[in-house]
């Protein structure tokens, strides 16, 4: 038996619960940055390592080595009597889940997969994730795992193709239809599309929430992060990626934030600029002001060209002049 989790938060507790089998982490942050179609294997790892290292201020080779180990670890699924996937409902987990359902079906065809994926648990007013649970609670969940059926894999595969496509139309179709086979996927994919610049101000939802946090007197990176996390219906973004978004907002020709200090994260504070206040008032457009190239999954947002933006009234993206 093999257990796979998109992080290392519960792996030791699975041992404490007495669950048999090896435990593996596979945690590519696919909800951040470029995930273009047509790129796999070493080329995909190289792209992802470069992106993660740049955003999180890490060494590229160290990140690449870690991603390579994670991919190599998936080969342990070959020949297993069962592979158990441990997930929750948020965007981070759901993007990893659709990738793994597709990937494991390809590298270990015929190996039975089972899934634990929840959005709530008894005793928690607000359930964040499996990391909240102790060994006994995780052991009880193991007994409630459900087998992954072929139609669940097909749903995941279609969603992954749409996620990596340069045009969000297929994602919109999936979201509209719903994903009862993977019940948390549609909401997660909609949250993904909300990371596009919005029509009204050119900010992603995360960027807007960061500015709102600072306007509400959260000034340190950690305080801003907590404020943004509390605003999320399903918390999904790690602190280092959100810190990178804070740095973005404090840079460029018209910064929305003023940064004091450079010793991350404890020696840094932020305050709003005139641009930041104008953005929150709907009187400026962040994407136009800064013209910074971006990727949201497979969607490329080049500077100075028509790009996909999230339209709040429609609840989905529209192609708009940059």
Roles of regions detected by a PLM:
Residues 229-263, 267:
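Charge-enriched amphipathic alpha-helical scaffolds
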